[in-house]
UniProtKB/Swiss-Prot annotation:
Name recorded for this polypeptide: 3-dehydroquinate dehydratase
Enzyme Commission identifier(s): 4.2.1.10
Entry annotated with the keyword Transcription regulation: no
Gene coding for it: aroD
Protein's organism: Staphylococcus epidermidis (strain ATCC 35984 / DSM 28319 / BCRC 17069 / CCUG 31568 / BM 3577 / RP62A)
A molecular function GO annotation: 3-dehydroquinate dehydratase activity
Length: 238
């Protein structure tokens, strides 16, 4: 059994509204990390990013910044080089704590090595992530994805996949559990949609260390409100 932190995903269109700030405050005890999604912005806006981070600094929570590309289920309509450039700019922003870096087998490993090392040199924790919104690959492929990602030595390995049957959920949980036993990286495994909700609430049973929830509208299929998620995760830790 591992301890599971709760990340609350927010995706503001502009600066944070008073309503959202109030909602974060009300639910602060259920949150360990604020995941700030910025791929919904028309273009990367460093000034706006700094303003939003400044707003979030009133809370004593870690800040994870994520730019999710459309290839992996987000709204960021950018090509590979544009995405890598955005990551490079984010790494030079010192105000937050964690950065999400998408992993893809199509990108040369040298590019990832450079980004991960630069981020870590700047004091950022790296969440190396891979998302498949179409299906759940076979168990061996899930394990191999974790294996290839861990070679980059990030702080977190995150794998999120879409299940089509109960066996898909079980395969994701097994891959997460097996990987957790053989790596020093923190593991995250998410089986999306309602079918896979057990992966969100029982992360710790299978070696997972981070579960993503929402404060307003879910930002991914199957996301649970953070207050409910915290309660459910805690049930397994008692």
């Amino acid at each position: 059994m591992t301890h599971v932190d709760i990340a609350a995903t927010i995706a503001p269109e502009d600066k944070l509204s008073k309503t959202l700030l109030k909602d974060i405050k009300v639910n602060e005890e259920s949150i360990d990390i604020i995941e700030l999604r910025i791929d919904q912005w028309p273009s990367f806006n460093k000034a706006l990013l700094n303003e939003v981070i400044k707003q979030l600094k009133i809370f004593h929570l870690k800040i994870l910044v994520t730019y999710r590309t459309s290839v992996q289920g987000g709204k960021g309509a950018v090509n590979e080089q544009e995405y890598l450039n955005i990551l490079g700019e984010l790494i030079e922003c010192p105000q937050f704590d964690m950065i999400d870096i998408e992993w893809s087998s199509a990108v040369k490993i040298e590019k990832y090595t450079h980004l991960v090392q630069r981020a870590q040199q700047k004091g950022l924790e790296v969440v190396l992530s891979h998302h498949n919104f179409q299906e759940t690959p076979a168990l061996d492929e899930l394990k191999f994805i974790y294996f290839k990602m861990q070679k980059l030595n990030p702080e977190y390995l995150k794998l999120a996949v879409m299940p089509k049957c109960q066996e898909d959920v079980l395969h994701l949980l097994e891959a997460m559990s097996l990987t957790a036993k053989h790596t020093t990286c923190r593991i995250v495994g998410i089986s999306m949609s309602s079918l896979g909700k057990v992966s969100r609430i029982a992360q710790g049973v299978f070696g997972g260390t981070l579960s993503y929830g929402c404060i307003e509208e879910p930002q991914a299929p199957g996301q649970i409100h953070v207050s409910k998620l915290k309660s459910m995760v805690s049930f397994y830790e008692d």
